[in-house]
Structure formats: structure tokens, C-alpha cells
Amino acid sequence: MNYSFTERKRVRKSFAKRVNNHQVPYLIATQLESYAKFLQADKPAMSRLTEGLQAAFTSAFPIVSNNGYARMEYVSYQLSQPPFDVKECQQRGYTYHSALRAKVRLIIYDREAPTKVKEVKESEVYMGEIPLMTENGSFVINGTERVIVSQLHRSPGVFFEHDKGKTHSSGKLLFSARIIPYRGSWLDFEFDPKDILYFRIDRRRKMPVTILLKAIGLNNEQILANFFNFDHFSLTANGGSMEFVPERLRGQLASFDVLDENGVVVIQKDKRINTKHIRELEAAKTKTIAVPDDYLIGRVVARNIVDPDSGEILAYANDEITEELLATLRDAGIKQLETIYTNDLDSGAYISQTLRTDETADQMAARIAIYRMLRPGEPPIEDAVEVLFQRLFYSEDTYDLSRVGRMKVNSRLNRPEMEGPMVLSSEDILDTIKSLVDLRNGKGEVDDIDHLGNRRVRCVGELAENQFRAGLSRVERAVKERLGQAETENLMPHDLTNSKPISSAIREFFGSSQLSQFMDQTNPLSEITHKRRISALGPGGLMRERAGFEVRDVHPTHYGRVCPIETPEGPNIGLINSLALFARLNEHGFLETPYRKVSNSKVSDEVVYLSAIEEAKYVIAQANATIDKSGKLADELVSARQAGETMMVSPERIDFIDVAPSQIVSAAASLVPFLEHDDANRALMGANMQRQAVPCLRPDKPLVGTGLERIVAVDSGTVVLAARGGIVDYVDANRVVIRVNDDETTAGEVGVDIYNLIKYTRSNQNTNINQRPIVKVGDRVARGDVVADGASTDLGELALGQNMTVAFMPWNGYNFEDSILISEKVVADDRYTSIHIEELSVVARDTKLGSEEITRDISNLAESQLSRLDESGIVYIGAEVEAGDVLVGKVTPKGETTLTPEEKLLRAIFGEKASDVKDTSLRVPSGMIGTIIDVQVFTREGIERDARAQSIIQEELQRYRLGLNDQLRIVEGDAFMRLEKLLIGKVANGGPKKLAKGTKIDKEYLADLDKYHRFDVRPADDEVASQVEAIKSSIEAKRKQFDEAFEEKRTKLTQGDDLQPGVTKMVKVYLAVKRRLQPGDKMAGRHGNKGVVSKIAPAEDMPFMADGRPVDIVLNPLGVPSRMNVGQILETHLGWAAQGIGKRVDEMVRQQAKQAELREFLKQLYNETGRIEDIDNFTDEQITVLAENLRQGLPFATPVFDGATEAEIGRMLELAYPEEVATSLKMTPSRQQMILCDGRTGDQFERPATVGVMHVLKLHHLVDDKMHARSTGPYSLVTQQPLGGKAQFGGQRFGEMEVWALEAYGASYVLQEMLTVKSDDVAGRTKVYENIVKGEHTIDAGMPESFNVLVKEIRSLGIEIDMERN
């Protein structure tokens, strides 16, 4: 097996039974690929595909002027290099973007000969700025990281559905169809309760569908011919005969005696016609059946009937036959007659009935009716009517089905080909109506709109493209207007275009769209989950209020595509989903999931991705089906799925098998060990709460994991990966330098990679992002190996919480209702200490009275308050500050006030300056204590920098120079090594230190020379001489390149900053706050078992084991049975085994056991069950490192749905606690429980308790952020009551129920002061304050302000109300 650098150091023992050959795909590939398709930045202009920006440009261009003499064509586009890198954009508050320039060609035609080109002008036009995606799939917009969430929306195409009988009181099913384009008007068809078929455009007023059919060019005869079969009759003097069609007679009631050709009665009147009767008629070779006139009356004429002599129309198509009409026809000598065939069962007369309600006569009248419906009140001019109708469904400018839409329409209407025009055709409309009528006649099925074959995902690229198109279409309109002037005023392409509309459309989308969200950066998992989220909300999606149960529910097609577990609790449940682990999008935007192919019950390694529609055809087995050694399905019957149904089938019928048991869940859910033993609701909470885990100061890998921790950590981008393999050359806390392997460098490339680590940086959620190197100088790393750990990662594995020894038992009520009791030792060891970084900023503006100044010179401030500020008035890095301390001194000019004579005198004596400025310094907010870790000063162009700003720039440049010097050092070292190899043993023509001609060059001679003088040696061989020259010039070129890079960096740093208008200077101060665990903090396991810390008990009071070790956490056993999340118990047992095995390894290491003994024990641990590890191929040194890392516990992986069995857990416990150890610890025989002792009395508890190790997380709901107190503060303007909430420094609400409580106690005085002086009696509360200051404790309650508000409210309703005082 191939282990990475970090994997080999600490191998995770996996219980997986199935070897999964199909690797989990790169978890943020969806985002990256989608945006790369949109930009196509790395493709040459000529070979770009028509998608993304290219598609937007080609659809908007060419633009032709209204007079047709000028035309603008698009040639190509290019994206420039971004001016600042990601880190610089975050610091300065810029957007990480690239300028888009399009090359366009302006062609002007000759007015005399319009086909002749008069002149052609080509130039590049600036088209605005396009935000770029960072390598981790996020965007930096105005300095903050954001994510564009993918949207799940209804796919374009045609859909058939019914109202489930809810519309009409009779419960009749009303069928409807809807054609949804990607953009353009929606077309709906619907039946009403009377079975008349209507259509609507864009949900406007409904009209009979035959109006639309006439508008597309059909007349009444054609309409009937399209929708009905015809019955043929021959008329005779008294009655007639009907053509005999067997299918149409079967099941009918005979309304007259039916005779065969010979006049024999075959079917008597009022009898139901059955198959026997039909056979008799066929046996008698019956061609026609005689019918009386009554049978003809009431039937509907299928074609216009014309008098052969006069040419007069006797009956129109769709007229009913009456006795009079029959007489007229016989008089006119009409012999043949066609009527439409209908019956009540499977061919209703719906279109015929609809045609009767339609009053339009011809195509034009029908189009005018549609025009009036869409544009009420406008006169229908023939041209306007024609243009409107064409633009509705037939024009590519206004209507676009899209490739997906065309594919869905063709497949739903059962057409063989999947391609076609992107606009609607008359056939599409006709076929849709036919399908809808068939549905009403009972043929076919309605569509399921929640099926993932009918919902598609719009990714970042597509959403951005739509915005870009919208901006481009505004530009197009403006250009069209100005093109007319192009020839007369001799304008260039860039004079005609204005990029503002494009920029504003893009800026609006990335800045404020509902789908552009502030990235959740609490920990690596929350980051990755946010990028894999799929939302049904947003523009063009669902509304939260209107989404019903069906849309939110889990659907069979979610299997392997969307996670059935991970979705938020609350109003968004089911509307926001997460992508399943292996899911990906196909070219049409539908979700696909991989399966392994099975043929003749043999499972192959071929992996096929299927969408929800394709999957329905196949029989698919689950991943846990038993497979024998030869790769065949072993069971007689295999559990399988087909089209959403589960069944047991024989192995021969299986077409595919799942690639992995974890394929149905998302990344977060697949990190929950023993997920299969948890109730679904709790699993949901567990998956969601992992995203809220705060990164701890000392990350600790979970002892019980699922094996996915490494993948999530690597894909999230928090850890640093080696871009190329090589040897570690230098390591410190800030950077890692790797000398790259020769075979991974190309000629002329720098053979050195420098990784600058992120140190103590603030995340979006104020948590701390910090990277720590995990390699040593001399280590050999391969490409993709982890070089440095990030936040919440431990040796390249995700580590969200800490492994705690837990006991399940009640403890004096301190774990009542899910509370958690924690040992003081946990706090003392800094297990849950986390660092939070607050960003505080202050700006100096130009005001009308003069400019604000950042300075140390502030009057009325004691020197002790200024002691932490430097001469520029900015706090030192490393200063420890608390609430109220000054961070940045700032003074603001004050308006001149009229002075009293006394003040004038004082001013005259003590000098002028003091009072015309006021102190507006930046201070530490209330409730915050911390250390200053960074300060950034931004100064506007043209304003002199202060000393602090200059020193910051100097430091930054020094750091940059250090990196360049490192690269140069390695490059030069490499070059001189090559030079030495080249020269030694060669004959010289001369050289420094009087080297004689013809001398052989040796090592000693070169060692004596200064490095750079070696280039002055003149080899006799010309070939060697030219190689020496090449090495020299490559070094010089590199030096020059590095110097240029340094100068560029200096320019960037020294140019003025782009600040908001009126701002001259901005200072950002970063404050690191250490948060220790304390009562009130929320904690949780990974199984939805959450609670609040109730007490931190001294370690000596905690229950302890027989060997004297106290437990870390005491949990309430009552939290398990009713919640049915038994996974936590299994995790606890397996964690206990992991810790016990760690202790055994630790003992062996301490006693310096022999290598062979250690190796044997490790082989026993790893290879008894589950996945086999390749321990034999480890070197002794690697075994030592592995054992060293296992001393804290052997990490286990129990993959979701394929995890450790009870027997395996038992076996691991036996290995961990041999008989004598188990006895000494007073364990039960199963080793899953033990007798504990009470820490306060030392007595044993009377029964064993479950003890083990659980991975427990500290969540982002910290009591420090919620704790808040107020004495006096701001009041609401209208009601004069105190505001609410910590952010407003508000008071505590004394609500309706609290008032009842005081009433119940009869505490009238308390109640009175609550409702008056403590709330909104303005005069009373001021008086109380005065009284308290004077030391008098009396209150005088007055009128609450809210009563006056009530009086005003009632008066506003026009009721006079006055307060009378007695």
C-alpha cells in the first residue's frame, strides 16, 4: 500500500469490510470546474467552447445599427493578471478580480453600395471586472471571503401534472401541462372542471386552447383531424350505414339491433357488445353496419360539408348533426359523411367542446385575441400583433429553451432525437396538447416534480454567466443606439461601449445576491460543507413560505446524489441540502452518482455515472451485498433497487452495484462514526453541529473516526500540501522551504518551493486560523503530502474536538436535562481553550470643521491610558488590553461654541488648544480582554505616512526579501554544484590565481576560489565553456527576476491605499482573545448529543477509577434511550479500547521492547480484522515513529454503514485490557463498564457505570458572546422602553408571562416599578437615578410613555380618547 508522509506516521486502523477502489472525488471540484468553464482563462482565444463568457459574447454580438450601415462584431476576450493577490485583497478590503477586455471589430458599410465595406476598425474594449475564484473555491469580495451556493431549480422542459383533486369540490383530477423555458414566457395548458382545455401565457388570463392552435395556423378541420379518429358513414334514404371498426364497438351499449351483411340480428338492442359479438360479425365478413338516423343525431361533423352543385357550405366542421341537417344533406344528395369518434372511456370530446367555446374565426383573429390578452388597452395593429406573436415563442432573442430544455421536451414527448432548435415549434405545442389530452383519456402518467430528473443544479459559473448576460444586454441596447453615429463622427469601438452596466450587474450578484453568502469559516468542515451546499431558494427558485412538504421531503432519487441527513433545522429544512459524497453534475446540470458495473453477477471495476433518469432503467444492488473471492455476487437473493422501489432479486438480474456504503451521505454526515446506529433526527443534529465546532488551541485527532478525516482536511485547503516532492531545506514557524526533486523541475524553473504559513489570522467567524509545520529539515516529502497543519487538523487529519474520558452516570443533578459536568483538569490542560481574533478598526475623515487626526496627543487622558500607544498614537503589538483601553488615539475638531466669561478667562490663562477637539479614540469594547497581535495602517494617496505605517512596510519588505534570498540561495547552490561537476577534471586555457594553460582543474583549486570567480576559469573545451556561460547567465537572469519582483512588491506597498471618499487614514487592530471553557458554554458529541456545561468540578471530586484516574466528563445516561442515538455508546466503547491499546504501546515503548515484539503487536492490532495494513514494509525507524504516535491511543476508522461490529469492538477491548488489567480496574467481563468511586467520599458507587472515550466538541455558542448586563443605556425612540439584545446594549424583557408571575405573588410594588421607572416612565426614571445618587431610596412612579403611544394610536383610528385625572 502507498502511504503518504503523514499517514505512515500514524496509521488509522480501519474496520472497513469492503475495499473501495473508487476514491472520493475532490470535494470542491463542482465549484472550481464550474467557474473554470465560465472563464476559460487558460484556453487560447480561438479554441474556446461556446459556454460561459464566450457564449454570452457570441449571443450578444454582432450588433447591427438600426439603419444597417454599421455593425459591431466580437472577436475574442482576455482576462488580465489580478493586480493584488488573495491575501493583499483581504487585508486592504479589495475584491480579488481580473479586468476583462474584449476585442471587437467595427465594420462600416458604404451607403451607396450597402454590401461594400467602407472601413473596419478593431480595438480592445474594457468590459468591467470579473471576480476570480481562489484555489479553495471561494471569492474575495471587498476583503471578505464569500461562497456562491449552487441552486436547485426546476429544469426547463415540459411537465405534466394534476391538482390531486384539490381544486374542485367533486375531487375530480384536473390535468395541466407547462412548458418552462430557460428564459422567456411560460406556456400553461389546463383543463377546467367542465373538461374544456385552456391555455395561459405567463400565468395571465386563460383562453381556450383552440385560439392558440388557430394562431399557429390550423383551421377547425385540421384541429379535429389532429385530435380525433373519424367514423365514416354512407347516407341512404332512411338511415345509413357505418364502416365496421371492431375496436370502437367493443364495450359499447347497442342502441339498436345490429345486423350482419345477411340481415341476421347479431346483437340485440340494449345489449353490451362483447368480444363474442365482434367475432361473429368478423366471421360473417361484415364491412358495414346499418344504423338508424337516431344513431347519427348528436354526432359531430368532422369536415366542412359542401353542396356539390352550389358550392355552399351546408355544415361546418364541429357542427352537431340535427334532424334538419340530415334532411338538408339528403336533399343536397350528400352520400358520404365523416364524424369524430369519441367515447366516455378513453377518447373524450374535449377539443371539440373547447372549439365550441372559441369565438375566433381565423389565424389573424386568434393572434389579435392573444395580443389583447397580453397588451390590454393597446390597439392591435397588424404588424405589432405579428411581431408580438413571433417574439413570444419563436424568437431566439426573447425565448431560449436551452439544450437541457430541448432534451427534456423531446424525451418527454417520446421523440427519438435529443437535439433541436432552442425555440418552440408548432409541433412542440401540438404534441404537448396531444399528450395532455391522452393523460385526460387515461393514457400515460403525470410527472413527479420532486424527481431529481426534473430538478437541475445551477452552479457558480452558470449563475455568473446569467448576470453577465443581463449586463451585456443593457450594453447591447446602448451600443445599438450609438452605432448610427459611428460613421458620421468617426468613433472607435471603445467610444461606443460603456462597461458600467456589466460591472454593476456582476458586483450586485457577488455582493448582495441571496446565493452569494458570507463564507462559514468556523472550521474546515463548515467551509467545505458551505461550498457543497445546494439551495432551492434564491432568485428563480422557491419561496420559503410557499414550499410545501413534498419539496422538502427525501425522495428516492436523492440516493447517492443529495444527502438525506444533512439539512438545517427550522424553516429551511429540506430546502437547503448537501451534495452526497460521490455525486457530481453532468453536462446538463443534473446530479449523477457512480455505480460499478455488474455483468452475469460478476462485479467489475468499471465505474459508470448515472443520472436519476438513467438510473430508473436498471436494477442496482447495495454496496453491502456479499461478494466472493472471484468478484461474483454470492447470495441467492440480493437486495436491490429499481425506479425507487426496493426488492429482492437474483444476482443475474443485477446491472450495477453502489461504489461505497457511504455514497448516500454528505461529507459532514460521513464523519459521524456508527451513524447507522443513530436515529435520523439526531444524526441530522450531529452532522450540523460538527460545523459549529470551534478550533481548539491544541487539536486532537478523534480516536474513533470514519477514515474520511484526512480527505476532508486536505480538500478544505486548511492544511499546506507539497506542490512538488523534494527534501525539506528549512523550517520555522512562518515558512517551510523545500528543495524540489530534479525530475519534477523543468529547465529554467526555480527548484525551490517556499510555503509561507498563515499565522494567527482571523476567519469570517472570528476563529483563529493558524498553520504549524509538521516536517523537519531533511524529511523527504512527495507531491500532495501534508507539510503543515492548519486550524482543527492534527497530522493532516480533521480534529474538531478533544478525546475525553466520559462516564455515563448522574452526579448530584449537575447533569440534569443534558447538562455536562466537566473536570477542572480539562480546563487546566487547556484542552478546550480556543483563540478568537477580533478586528477593530478606526478611520480618520475630513470633516467640515477640519480633518480628524490619529495622534498620541490627547488632552484629558491620563498617561497610564496612553502607556500602550507609540508616538503615532497606535497601540503596540503584544500589549495586553481590556475593556475601555485606548487602542488608537484620535481627535475630532469640535464646532466653536459660545463661551462664558469664566471659560474665556481659563482659556486665556491655560492656552488655546485643549477644547476645540474632542476625544474619539478607538477603545476596546465592553467585555473583551486580549492581546494585540497585529496592526495595519492604511493611508490615502498623497498623505504622508506616519512612523508606524513606515515601520510596518519595512517589516513586510524584509520578510519578502528573506523569501527571495532563500530561493536565490538554493538556486545558486544548485548552479555552483553543476558548475563544479562540469569543471573538475577538465583542461583549462587559463584562469584566476595565475592558472597555467593546459592545467587540469581539481577540487582544491576551485575550493580556493571565491564562488563568483569560478566563472572566470577558461576551459579549453568550447562545449564546456558555453555550458559555463549558460549557468552564469541563468543565475544573472534569476537575480534580475528577483530584484524586479522585490521592486514590484515595494511599489505595491508604498503606493497609497484606495480608501472610501473622505477617509484619510484607516487603522485596523487585531486583538486575540483566549477563551477557556466555562459554565454556560455549549458542547456536543457527534451524534446530536448536545448540552451546556453546568459546573467545572475540581478533579479530586470527580468519579475515579480503581487506578485513581478521574474521568473528564460525566454525562447523563437518560440522554440516550429516548433519543435513540446509540452510536455514542458504541463510540465510547471503541474509544476506550483505543485508549487502552495506546497505554499498552506506551508501556512497550517505555520498557524499550524489542522491534520484532513491537512489530508483531502492531500486526496483531491492524491485521486481525478490517482493512489489512502493510506493516511488514515499514522500516524500523518508521515503526518507532508509528509507536511513538500511538502512545495516546490507536486511532480507529469505522466507516459509515461499514463499521466495526459488536464482536470487533469486543475483540479490541480484549486486546486493550488483558484479563489482569481488567480485573485490577474492576471492569465487568465485557470490559464495557467498571466500578467507579466517588471523588468526594472515596466510596464505591453501588453499580458499574459505562466508561469510555468520546470525541467531544466545543461549539461556537460561547457564553462570553452571550453574557451581557446593563444598568442604564439606550432607549427606543417611540415607546421610550430600553432596547433589547447585546448588540444594542439592551435590557432584559419583562414580558407578559413574567407580569402574570408577579401578579400571582401579589408583588404590586415590584410590578409597579417594573412597568414604570425601570421601563418607560421618563420623568420617573430620571428622578429615581437622582434619588439613588443622593442616597434617598424612594420612588415616585408616573405615567408610562407607552400609554401615551396607545392613546395616540387610538386617536389615529379617529376615536377621541382623553385621560381624566381625579
Curated annotation (Swiss-Prot):
Q: One Pfam family of this protein, by short name? A: RNA_pol_Rpb2_6
Q: What is its EC number?
A: 2.7.7.6
Its annotated function is as follows: DNA-dependent RNA polymerase catalyzes the transcription of DNA into RNA using the four ribonucleoside triphosphates as substrates.
Kindly give the CDD domains that the UniProt entry links to this protein: RNA_pol_B_RPB2
Give the reactions, separated by semicolons, that this protein catalyses.
RNA(n) + a ribonucleoside 5'-triphosphate = RNA(n+1) + diphosphate
One MF annotation (Gene Ontology) recorded for this entry: DNA binding
Q: Tell me the protein's name.
A: DNA-directed RNA polymerase subunit beta
Q: Which organism is it from?
A: Polynucleobacter necessarius subsp. necessarius (strain STIR1)
